[in-house]
Design a protein with these regions (language model features):
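Short alpha-helical scaffolding segments that buttress acidic/His motifs in well-ordered protein cores
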Residues: 56-57, 109-113, 148
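Well-ordered beta-strand positions
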Residues: 15, 55, 59-61, 67, ...
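C-terminal long alpha-helix characteristic of the crotonase
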Residues: 18-23, 65, 74-126, 139, ...
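Hydrophobic alpha-helical segments typical of transmembrane helices
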Residues: 40-43, 52, 105-108, 128-131, ...
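CoA-thioester-processing core
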Residues: 3-57, 88-92
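Helix-turn-helix DNA-binding module
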Residues: 5, 69-71
Length: 159
């Protein structure tokens, strides 16, 4: 389950993955006479939209992982066994780390995506250009471009 504060913590993550048929999500704080005040109202609204977030929080109802996936609160539902879940997810996540991806590029993508919606569009474009310019000077960008031209898999080092 990811309920209350647990969901508030999960919503701070870049990607949320749940194991199929293993729980529910929700912010039932209304049933205690309070609100999800550790980023819950702000993050849920941004993730799933105002109307669905309001409905979820004012009813206090929990939703299945499948329903949470349908409204983009969960990115992926994993069908593996409970015993293999952690290992499978760590294996899956390795695609975003060295040597498979350039970590500076991953970081800059995250920065642009997280900051962009909070600033005017033209500033977002300027931020994107600034982040891209910094990446073009990296060893990893040179490796990635060379690997593409040479039709081979890049071996990123984090530089």
């Amino acid at each position: 389950h990811a309920v209350g504060g647990g969901l508030e913590i999960a919503m701070a993550a870049d990607i949320r993955i749940a194991r199929k048929n293993s729980g529910k999500v929700g912010l039932p704080e209304i049933n205690l006479g309070v609100l999800a005040g550790t980023g819950g109202t702000a993050r849920l609204t941004r993730l799933i939209g105002k109307a669905k977030a309001l409905e979820m929080m004012v009813t206090g109802e929990l939703m299945s992982f499948e329903d949470a996936h349908a409204c983009n609160l969960i990115n992926h539902i994993w069908e593996g066994s409970p015993e293999d879940f952690r290992r499978d997810i760590l294996d899956w996540c390795s695609q975003f780390t060295l040597p498979n991806k350039a970590v500076k590029a991953v970081g800059n993508i995250k920065r642009s995506c997280q900051t962009g919606p909070e600033i005017p569009f033209e500033y977002h474009l300027a931020l994107e250009r600034e982040l891209q310019a910094a990446l073009f000077n990296s060893t990893d960008a040179k490796e990635g471009i060379a690997a593409y031209v040479e039709k081979r898999v890049a071996n990123f080092t984090g530089n």
